[in-house]
Amino acid sequence: MEELEILRKKLYSIQRQDNTQKLSERNCIEIIVKMIDLKMIDIIHSLDGKEYITPKQLENEIKDEILKCGGRVVVCDLQSILSIDIIHIEEALEKLKKRDKSIQIYQGEIMTRYYLDSILQEIQEQLQEVGKLHINDLSNRFSIGVDFLINLIEQNLKKFNRSLNNSTNNNNNNNNILLKNIIFDNQEVLYTQSHINRHYHKVIGLFSSITQPILINNVIKQHQNHYQLNERLVRQQLQELIENKRINGFIQGKASNAEFIPTIFSQSRLKWIDSFYHQNQFITFDSVSKLQINEPQSFLKNTFTDGLLLHSCFIHKSLIDKIDDNIIEIIENSNWLDLIPLLPPLTDKDISMIVSNCPNMKTNNAILLGNSFIISKSFVDRCFTLLQKTIQERMEKQQLILENIASSNIKKQQQSKSEIIDQKIETTTTTTTTTQPSKKKDNLINSDDDDNQDNNKKSSKGKNKKSKQQQSSIQKLINDSEDDYKVYNKKQENNNNNKKVDHLKEINQLLSKWYENMEEELVESLSQYLRPLVNQSWESMVKEAKEKLENETQKQRKQQLQQLNSQFFSLYNSFLLFRKGLQSLNDADDDNGKTIIALEKHLLKTVGINITNLLIEINANYHMLDKTTFETPSERSLILSQFPPQLSKSFEKLIQSLNKSTLNDFIDSLENVCSQSQIKLKSLDKKLEKQLLIENQNELEEQFLNEIDVGNQFQIIVNLMYIRYKNNYIFSPPRLIGKLVSTLVMDTSIDKEIITRLTKLHQEIVKLITNNKLSNQDNDNDSTELNDHIKFFKDLILN
């Protein structure tokens, strides 16, 4: 530095001299920069570049500036004050901090120890004046962060505490301690010990005068303006006073709900609770809560060991023993008990809990009803037995009524259908031109053909025995009636499913009738208890009856299906027999097949329709439809709509084939439907054909003996002659019977006398019909020749 000073002086003297050769400022700057680069000198230039300063001088100037500012200065302010770049200032400050521990930097500010000590000294002086200071107020006052200020205060307090613990060094350290006898509460408030003592005595005075429970927060708010109480300090000191028994009482609750309860109040309260409990054998939680006890359940449980906690009250166990003794009595006598007179005014839930704690209730020999009645199980069982017997009698009566109704309906339908069956049997093989057609189920195809006049005179069993036809028809009528009854039952079942039978009203009435002295509330409660049992018993009875009826119905349906199948095959075999007869007649047809076409149409309109209807009924039974029979085309269409789509279409084709003139389309459609219905069709063999011919012949002979109408007698004679000599049966309407006569006349194997008499008989019949003399055959038929011919054929047939 001395050399530098010498050089500076030389430079100054040279510059002062008048010389023609002088260095410019630029040259001087370049020389200095070169010397700095060569590390010949260590200097720092100012911000304007016109001045230079050494690092040592910079440190000195920083110290001077700190002293000038009272020990606290902002680092950024030094740049403008010293006109030195901030980087050089920060480097100089780091060196200063290492050498001088009293200097520290906090949030961009330089603070010295003596400055911080002055702050602590000022805090100490102010505390002695006011007694307490808040840390936030101090932070705002000194413009220092709260954390830094807290740390500063705590360090000083730690030194003070260590000095108290170390008495040997106490005198040496007291000089460095500025805060003495200070309490720093929760790093928020500074108190002097004298202030704490004054606050302590305020708490003693306030809470010693309290005789009623009061919230601690309310005490603080009421006396805040006058005593300036601190909530946290009050709680802490009050707890300490209670523990030291300086104040008689206790704190109940926490935080803002903390409540001070003086001992004098708790003692009088406990005395009242004890007196009420032992006099009444119970006490409610509400009454205890009104005495400012926050947890009455825990309080009562800890206070009285001979009681039981319920939902809303606390009772003495002697009440349970009293109720239990009465329960034993009603169990032994099969009676009931009303609890209301035996108990204090309790809630339903309390009574239920009392009953559940009775030992005899755990044996399941008694039950609680209506929340206040105990009734023995044996008494309940007796009531249920009586009710069950009553509803069983009711069920039997209803079942008997239904059976009578169903039986009556069946008898009526049997009677009506028997009349129809008899009419069918009479018109199966014998018709006259005067017979009026009747509307029947056997003919559901509308046609303009004249054959419709004769459709009603043919039945599905026309070629079987009369007795078999009657039995099968009557059995079918019975099955139809049972189907109707099943439909009724299904409707009833659907109604029952939608709305189940409830016997509550009936149970209530019966119990009131049987036990007149029983309380109305108990009657209602017992009815509600027995209600599901009685309803379930009723439902089981109904279910059992339904299952029985369903089993019978299924059995009947199965039998009916078997009968329908038997009828179908019998009718189908007759159809094959009639078809074979038409084929034999085809060879002798001499009118271009018109007669054959008419006979085939007649066969389709009669036997074909019956086969179709019978097949629909078989499928309706197979698919378990509610309605299996029908009387009109609309009813038949409704049944077909419930079949599977493919089967329904096949039936539509079968019905359409009935309106055609040939049998081939009908047979093809019939085979298709039978294949889908799992019905196997068989051809007519010789043995069965012969059997059918014999049966039809015997039936015609029997009808001939009982027939008095001449026209019908003639038709029977022609059919019998055709069966005898042609071994075939032609199913012909009356208007085409002449074709059969012509065929027989052309047969050379028949005796000429028979042919002659048959021809004359035909002529007489035609003559009578033409002259309208058959209107009253019993009185008007006086033709001797006609009677002679008929007598001849009668003898021939019978022999």
Curated annotation (Swiss-Prot):
Q: Which domain of life is it from?
A: Eukaryota
Spell out the disulfide connections: none
- What's the protein name? E3 UFM1-protein ligase 1 homolog
Q: Name one GO cellular component term.
A: endoplasmic reticulum membrane
**Keyword annotations of the record:** Transferase, Ubl conjugation pathway
Protein family per UniProt: Belongs to the UFL1 family.
Query: What GO biological process terms does the UniProt entry carry, in alphabetical order?
Result: protein ufmylation; response to endoplasmic reticulum stress; reticulophagy
User: What is the enzyme's main class?
Assistant: transferase
Name the species this protein comes from: Dictyostelium discoideum
